[in-house]
Amino acid sequence: MDGGNQSEGSEFLLLGMSESPEQQQILFWMFLSMYLVTVVGNVLIILAINSDSHLHTPMYFFLANLSFTDLFFVTNTIPKMLVNLQSQNKAISYAGCLTQLYFLVSLVALDNLILAVMAYDRYVAICCPLHYTTAMSPKLCILLLSLCWVLSVLYGLIHTILMTRVTFCGSRKIHYIFCEMYVLLRMACSNIQINHTVLIATGCFIFLIPFGFVIISYVLIIRAILRIPSVSKKYKAFSTCASHLGAVSLFYGTLCMVYLKPLHTFSVKDSVATVMYAVVTPMMNPFIYSLRNKDMHGALGRLLDTHFKRLT
């Protein structure tokens, strides 16, 4: 397993966060519980939105797609992690590692872009309510979502293709929970300057520009809310944005904990922060968006009531 270029038959060893059998058992049950909560929560959000005509609006259209992305995101990483925690064989093939990396990178970018589009939706709803129906037409919503998908797919392809040019030497042991770009680049023995340059350039375009757009949108939203004379209307306007603002803060906060640092300082200690954006954020999003949302409460109640009646 030493030296030379990777071939299709070569493997990495995903050792995870701990090599202690006792700790691995604890981690297994913890991640299994979090995975099941994430799957159930996001599936319920998708089903509730699809089954309730009152939720067939741009905001919930994007929320359903965000839930689908989060569902896909955790399914890309956690099942393999659970298998590794219960197995002595912790190997992942080179092709499997790159596949996991591709979906990881693409889906993080997609999550980011959808959150930016949702910020625009909230801006139009609060700042231009009279033009909301025309400004957020079904055609525009589909166009915006399609653009998010195209950009995220291209972003993932660029970095995955560049990773195939990297040579790995020495130990193939990855003290991490999945195949993560920074971890793989730290293991490289070839020149990764082009990877690093492209990572910064594309990262600024895919992450910093949407993040800046989100910040500007919320500055304008808060200004508009403060101008509303009625206290009850202020509260209603803010409550429609609070859940999205919470999701944005959680997503970017955890992402910054991992990636807002030089590549050479990246270490296995960052795996804890990675768990936050890779596992905790997708798990928390359904709770954040439904906690104080009466429309979502009603839709979920009707959905569960219908299914319980069918069972009885």
UniProtKB/Swiss-Prot annotation:
UniProt KW keywords: Cell membrane, Disulfide bond, G-protein coupled receptor, Glycoprotein, Membrane, Olfaction, Receptor, Sensory transduction, Transducer, Transmembrane, Transmembrane helix
Transmembrane segments: 26-49, 58-79, 101-120, 140-158, 197-219, 237-259, 272-291
Coiled coil: none
Cited SUPFAM superfamilies: Family A G protein-coupled receptor-like
Main location: membrane
Disulfide-linked positions: C97-C189
Localization terms from the record: Cell membrane
Taxonomic classification: Eukaryota, Metazoa, Chordata, Craniata, Vertebrata
Species of origin: Gorilla gorilla gorilla
Record's bilayer topology term: Multi-pass membrane protein
GO cellular component term of the entry, any: plasma membrane
Residue ranges that the UniProt entry lists as topological domain Extracellular: 1-25, 80-100, 159-196, 260-271
Name used for this protein in its record: Olfactory receptor 1D2
GO biological process: detection of chemical stimulus involved in sensory perception of smell
Glycosylated position list: N5, N195
